[in-house]
A protein has these predicted regions:
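Conserved SAM-binding loop
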Residues: 2-3
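Hydrophobic/aromatic anchor residues within beta-strands of the central parallel beta-sheet
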Residues: 13-16, 63
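A short acidic, Gly/Pro-enriched loop at the edge of an enzyme's catalytic core
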Residues: 22-34
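A short glycine-rich, Lys/Arg-flanked "PGG" loop and its adjoining helix->strand segment in the class I
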Residues: 47-62
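Core SAM-dependent methyltransferase catalytic element
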Residues: 113-116, 137, 180-195
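C-terminal helical/coil "lid" or tail adjacent to the Rossmann-like core of SAM-dependent
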Residues: 119-177, 192
Length: 195
């Protein structure tokens, strides 16, 4: 998919590789910018990934990340099915060892990894009717269904009913669908090691 994206836009000099984000095997200090988007939310030890990002940045280079904080996802008017889905989603992530609210923690992870000039901002989106992201929370819970059932967070019937009711509510064009927060953080690798 990434190769098709690059080729479709005529981007040259792009190498696509698959690697463990904790140990990429790439040379240290070889990038002006190291960026990750919605990666840390999916790993149990995000500090290891941040350490690798810092290792890859050249002295004076930048590390940036965009990570979600799922706590703020909502809809208006509120609906109990959507609210319950928004409870099941982070509970499933947490039980898998990931942090669904990692966005707010990224600046601190960057500081602990030795970055300076750390900054942070956050964005929220309103998903209009017809936008595929409008049902993202419901879609993700549907995709995690086997895990949810195995963990005992909800039963088959409850999941079916929640899915149908939440989708019907979001199908109403009068319903306002609000994303969780997306935190953007950045920091600079010091030009020389601190003493």
């Amino acid at each position: 998919m990434a190769a098709e994206f690059a080729a479709g836009r005529g981007l040259g000099g792009v190498e696509i590789m698959t690697a463990d984000a904790r140990r990429t095997g790439l040379p240290s200090g070889s990038f002006d910018l190291v960026h990750a988007r919605t990666l840390l939310v999916n790993v149990p030890e995000p500090a290891q990934v941040v350490a690798e990002m810092v290792r890859l940045a050249r002295p004076g280079g930048w590390v940036a990340g965009m990570e979600p904080d799922t706590e703020y996802a909502s809809c208006y008017p509120p609906h109990p099915a959507f609210t319950r889905i928004c409870e099941i989603f982070p509970a499933t992530f947490s039980r898998n060892g990931a942090d669904p609210m990692i966005g707010r923690r990224v600046p601190e992870l960057f500081r602990r990894a030795g970055l300076v000039d750390v900054g942070v901002d956050a964005r929220v989106q309103i998903y209009p009717p017809g936008n595929s992201r409008r049902t993202i929370r419901i879609d993700l819970v549907r995709s995690m269904r086997p895990q949810i059932l195995e963990m005992g967070l909800a039963g088959e019937t409850e999941l079916d009913e929640l899915d149908a009711a939440a989708r019907a509510h979001l199908d109403d064009p009068r319903t306002v669908a609000v994303s969780g927060l997306l935190f953007m953080a950045w920091g600079r690798k010091t030009a020389r090691p601190s003493t």
